[in-house]
């Protein structure tokens, strides 16, 4: 870590020492004042970190050896990197940096990317401690993951795809979950128990493969990328999230266009047909193509939904606040009629997940909503929704919310 600290900006080192001071954390030579007492015998020397030399600060910081302390320092340096980016003028932004800026300035960014990566199995990028040249790198790789539901209600990584700027596949591997799996979500992921039976790679192996890219300041690209980073257990500040970059006009900022709708609007094709399982390499490539459409072709990040897209939205119902212990197969009982379920992995390893019910037409979706035996209400944005109680095959009960995607006319 000393070599990496030696390349850090003086201002970053000042803030890191102040952080350690505020938490009264101790390295091998004690806290900051105790360190100075040993390191510098001159009683008149200043203790304010901003008045100490670059070398003094590095000497103190290198006395911290515990992994959790190092994780804390790197996280704080990365946070400073993002805050500095927000304060800097946009005039000199490269197109890639502009997309990073659009991501980190989105109202949902701070919540979606507020990881707590202090456990042993997390990898925290050290790019915030690098020289400005490295931090300004415009190299990009796109990432997408497939996840399953584990016995303890968390998400388990089972496949990861990574492509570079030229859409060359860097990584396409199955990963062995380290917990028992209760739902492979095969209809969504296309993955079965047999697919990962012989998988030998772990999350740590994937982290080690990506580490050279992260340490050189490469930008990670993805759609709802926070979900992928959460399951990869990677904290990296330089991200382009196409779910946050692109937006619909005259709609609430928190409404995010789907990857499929973005591809239809900007690239002119669907990333997948309805009912076809996900493919992480295809999804990673789609996210990279969307980023490149802005970088190379200056495509507008505000997209206008077509009549076809609006009709597609009307033909959906949104099932949300689904407890993680409810298998996706049990959701079939909630709605009547013919539909396909598109299950979405949880944004974080929390208590709930969500799904879309895709109907043949808006009329079918409206009829299914009317037939739901539940309490009707509206959400905070005035969209009609119902809360329904279902009985699971296990004998227990669960409450689920079902919401329309568009206001009633």
From Swiss-Prot:
CDD domains: REX1_like (cd06145), RRM_SF (cd00590)
Keywords of the record: Exonuclease, Hydrolase, Nuclease, Nucleus
A GO biological-process term: miRNA catabolic process
Coiled-coil intervals: none
Pfam families: RNase_T (PF00929)
Chief location bin: nucleus
Superkingdom of origin: Eukaryota
Cleavable signal peptide: none
KO phenotype (gene knockout): No visible phenotype; due to the redundancy with other SDN ribonucleases. Simultaneous knockdown of SDN1, SDN2 and SDN3 results in elevated miRNA levels and pleiotropic developmental defects.
Similarity comment: family membership: Belongs to the REXO1/REXO3 family.
Protein name: Small RNA degrading nuclease 1
Species for this entry: Arabidopsis thaliana (Mouse-ear cress)
